[in-house]
Amino acid sequence: MNSKWQLLLGRVLLSVIFILSGLGKLPHFHDVAGMMAGKGIPLASVALVITLLIEIGGGLMLLTGYKARYAALVIAVWMVPVTLVFHNFWAVPAAQQQDQMINFLKNLAIIGGLLVTASASSAAVTSKK
């Protein structure tokens, strides 16, 4: 498989978690906003709308290749505070630490993949560079 198709496959695989995560939040908007407020997120409903735009919109941009570099960079930057706030394994009870550390490290790996995507060669299969 040449690198052009590897980049396409990588983008498609990265997009799935964001699209499905965003779509999964839609029917539970008020519950998710309440959970976000409980984590100390100000204007949780507004923050959730932004989250949905980033997850669904950015995920679709990754999937289709439309401005994929920009989408990958925006999602990566957004994931930093999300990871620190929602997967703070150092501040949870011992019974939750392992699961939260795995999610924290998973997010770091996803951020790494997004940064690679953002810096990928313009030879990638995409609708717009």
Region spans (language model):
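Extended, low-polarity transmembrane helix blocks
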Residues: 1-27, 37, 45-53, 57-129
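Cytosolic, membrane-interface loops and tails of multi-pass inner-membrane proteins
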Residues: 32-39
